[in-house]
């Protein structure tokens, strides 16, 4: 399996690995904007923004997003860690363009409505409650705080109830504009396809993404 890399004019890195033995297509977008890039007042915003991304776009509702993934027989995932926020979709190889278009729509055209923001904030509060009642999570959080103190690595990826309560649409929109740009994104895919095709589809669906500036760890 050969790995190839092309950098688009807007800074987006396009990486492919061809695998002729599989009938599946896996695509992911990795954004260089995990919790290490947050200020203390922003703590939790990277994870919050990740949650909001699948809630609807200018062309699709949340239900339509989920229905399209189901119709394709695919599955999607998203996660946030200290360094990155990532989004992925897996479908049959013949549905690869549909997956790329959907992922681009989700990342470029998400609409963060006040109702969805309030609803998703409560979802994250529930995640916090579950973590607070999980001994492994409590240990890991305590260890990070002890070792790193007030540095970004010492803060919880989920944020706190105080910081999340102060994060609204203006803050989420600003975070997305700052972080979800060509200089911060890597589009990576694996399956039975040619690298040149992936580059062409990346230019077609991600070409309007602004270059922006590379995010700096705090």
Language model region names:
Residues 1-24:
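N- or domain-start disorder-to-order transition segments that initiate the globular core
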Residues 17, 217-218:
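Short, solvent-exposed loop/turn elements at beta->coil junctions and helix N-caps
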Residues 15, 28, 186-189:
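Structured core elements
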Residues 13, 32, 46, 134-135, ...:
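Hydrophobic alpha-helical segments, principally membrane-spanning helices and signal/leader peptides
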Residues 2, 7, 62-217:
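Charge-rich, well-structured scaffold segments of protease-associated domains
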Residues 21, 26-90:
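M16/MPP (pitrilysin/insulinase) zinc-metallopeptidase core fold and M16-derived inactive scaffolds
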């Amino acid at each position: 399996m050969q790995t190839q890399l092309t950098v688009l004019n807007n800074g987006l890195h396009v990486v492919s690995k061809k695998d002729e033995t599989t009938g599946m297509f896996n695509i992911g977008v990795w954004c260089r904007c995990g919790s290490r890039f947050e200020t203390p007042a922003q703590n939790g915003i990277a994870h919050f923004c990740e949650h909001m991304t699948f809630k609807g776009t200018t062309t699709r509702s949340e239900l339509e997003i989920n229905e399209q993934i189901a119709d394709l027989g695919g599955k999607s995932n998203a996660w946030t860690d200290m360094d990155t926020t990532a989004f992925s979709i897996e479908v049959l190889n013949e549905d690869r363009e549909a997956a790329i278009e959907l992922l681009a729509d989700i990342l470029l055209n998400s609409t963060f409505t006040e109702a969805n923001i309030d609803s998703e904030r409560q979802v994250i509060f529930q995640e916090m409650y579950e973590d607070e009642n999980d001994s492994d999570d409590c240990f890991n959080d305590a260890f990070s705080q002890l070792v790193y103190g007030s540095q970004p690595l010492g803060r919880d990826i989920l944020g706190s109830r105080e910081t999340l309560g102060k994060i609204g649409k203006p803050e989420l929109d600003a975070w997305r504009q700052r972080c979800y740009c060509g200089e911060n994104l890597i589009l990576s895919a694996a399956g039975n396809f040619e690298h040149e095709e992936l580059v062409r589809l990346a230019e077609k669906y991600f070409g309007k993404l602004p270059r922006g500036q590379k995010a700096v760890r705090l």
